[in-house]
Amino acid sequence: MNAAPVPILLTQRRYARVATPENPLVLESGQRLTDVTLCYEVFGRLNPAGDNAILVCHALTGDSHVAGRYRPDDPKPGWWDDAVGPGKALDTDRYCVICSNVLGGCQGSTGPSSVNPATGRPYGLDFPLVTVRDMVRAQARLLDLLGVRRLLAVIGGSLGAMQALEWAATYPDRMRGIIPIGGAGRFHPQGIAFNEVQRQAILNDPGFLGGQYYGTPGPVRGLATARMLGMITYRSDESMWTQFGRNPQGEANPLHQGFAVAYQVESYLHYQGRKLVERFDANSYLYLTRAMDLMDLGRGRGSYEEAHARIQARVLAVGIRSDLLFPTYLQRETVELVRASGGRAEYVEMDSPWGHDAFLLDFPLIEEPIRRFLQELEAEENA
């Protein structure tokens, strides 16, 4: 007999106003945002106690569409469909899974492309700098509106892992556990360096127009180039040998191509650059990469070590063997610092060749550890 077809998980974007003139969002910088909307999606149902929710935090160019489809005929599901859904590790029959687009983003949440209520035109570079802590504080307001009393867990990869750690330090009693994947409580110097080169590609594009390029093509070449460099940091040498090797693009003979695309790996990078330009705002790219640079769990908390002592949640830190952007010593350090202050933390390493993007491309490698961790948290909650 043929297996029954798997039902399509349908979802929709929702919007919540989390800051108003009467209740502004005060940022770490001291600046205020008086009108903030977050775009979010919900999968599964929140239980009456309000304690079965899992917050998924997305990476740099992600959005709220973590899983499912908006329509049955959508060609592609959300960006982490392997992880979220009925019977999956983040089981929507069991948990209420919530994902929001971050503050400063461009996929429905307030960011530099949003209209500045003071001027009636897009903020552009008048938008204040935001930090990961600011993102988390905005998310906390959203969860309050949704009736979430206590999170079962916060999970995310890359920038999402930074958010998970910030959640545990800012709101120590609001979750039972966190699962930061390929991230850290502060960005390392090489990561900041990668981000600065990407930003310069955007800032030096003649189409940038001081950040007020809305209504024009914008800095398309700069954003595409930034994405090309970013993609290099998301993969590994091993994965590039496997996927591309030194293979020429099509029938091209590299000896006769001059500086045109000659190799498959070059073609891939150009393709990724073009794809991002179609769906992402260059200003958001600037703001979110800077938020990663500014990430420092210890800021205002005495020291980096003291910040980890604030964490009461259980921690499952996931490293990726081949990660160039967030090397595994960073996740091991997180575990050591939490344990040093008496907290509970464990480390799991993905033995994947796919580099930083392995949490998206090789999720089955960590499905069982995550499923087990969540079930243990649930058992503790019900004990």
Curated annotation (Swiss-Prot):
It catalyses: L-homoserine + acetyl-CoA = O-acetyl-L-homoserine + CoA. GO terms for biological process: homoserine metabolic process; methionine biosynthetic process. Its EC number is 2.3.1.31. Pfam families: Abhydrolase_1 (PF00561). GO terms for molecular function: homoserine O-acetyltransferase activity. It is an enzyme of class 2 (transferase). Transfers an acetyl group from acetyl-CoA to L-homoserine, forming acetyl-L-homoserine. This is Homoserine O-acetyltransferase. It comes from Symbiobacterium thermophilum (strain DSM 24528 / JCM 14929 / IAM 14863 / T).
